[in-house]
């Protein structure tokens, strides 16, 4: 693990020096992830930002949150493709929901430049991405979907967040108990029974396997 961290840290430093941007590296989940990241680094070093974006995008589409952050950085800067605030916000929000704290600054900056209609469109894209991951049985999307309803929507949806935090707790996903309980405090007592029933129904519908730390993703997953 220490060797892998050192390896990735060196790659992050290299990219940052070349780009002058806050590109982030990952603790790759597999040898193939390491190879993909190395290829992206080589592309950046060669000033082939278009190829770097293509490589990062492949990983970003697989919910690798560091790659999503790198997509946001490059697209915000207009490196490799023309500047695109909509796509940069999309990847930035997904990275933020995946636990990349630095992505919050990118999202905040971009929000100041877009119209509310544009932001609404991106919010919908993010929600669709997370919903698709849930439909595909991605247990890591559960807490992110709950967080989405509190931190990305214009008005927090405490009810939906509570439902998914409740499911997360039932599946032994770490650090979800406090989030569920805190969210419960924002819900009227008359709504609790209905929401708990809905949580049980969704829990049975999706039939996720319980969270297994040994099978969980590395730094790329939340």
Predicted regions, residues:
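Bacterial N-terminal signal peptides
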Residues: 12-22
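Hydrophobic face of amphipathic alpha-helices that form TPR/SEL1-like repeat modules
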Residues: 36-43, 55, 70-77, 106-113, ...
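Terminal, low-structured helical/coil segments at or just beyond the last alpha-helical repeat
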Residues: 33, 117-138, 175-222
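Short coil/turn and helix-start
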Residues: 45-46, 61-62, 75, 79-83, ...
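N-terminal leader/linker segments that initiate helical-solenoid repeat arrays
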Residues: 24-55
């Amino acid at each position: 693990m220490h060797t892998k961290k050192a390896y990735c840290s060196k790659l992050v430093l290299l990219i940052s020096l070349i780009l002058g941007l806050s590109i982030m590296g990952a603790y790759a989940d597999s040898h193939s992830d390491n190879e993909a990241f190395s290829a992206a680094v080589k592309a950046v070093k060669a000033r082939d930002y278009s190829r770097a974006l293509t490589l990062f995008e492949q990983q970003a589409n697989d919910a690798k949150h560091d790659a999503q952050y790198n997509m946001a950085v490059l697209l915000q800067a207009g490196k490799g493709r023309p500047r695109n605030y909509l796509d940069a916000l999309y990847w930035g929000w997904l990275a933020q929901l995946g636990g990349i704290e630095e992505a919050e600054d990118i999202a905040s900056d971009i929000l100041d430049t877009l119209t509310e209609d544009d932001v609404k469109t991106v919010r919908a894209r993010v929600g669709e991405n997370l919903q698709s991951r849930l439909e595909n049985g991605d247990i890591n999307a559960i807490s992110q979907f709950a967080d989405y309803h509190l931190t990305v929507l214009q008005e927090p949806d405490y009810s939906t967040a509570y439902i998914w935090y409740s499911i997360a707790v039932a599946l032994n996903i770490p650090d979800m108990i406090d989030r569920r309980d805190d969210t419960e405090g924002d819900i009227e007592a008359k709504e609790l029974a209905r929401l708990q029933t809905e949580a049980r129904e969704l829990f049975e519908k999706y039939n996720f396997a319980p969270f297994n730390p040994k099978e969980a993703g590395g730094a790329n997953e939340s």
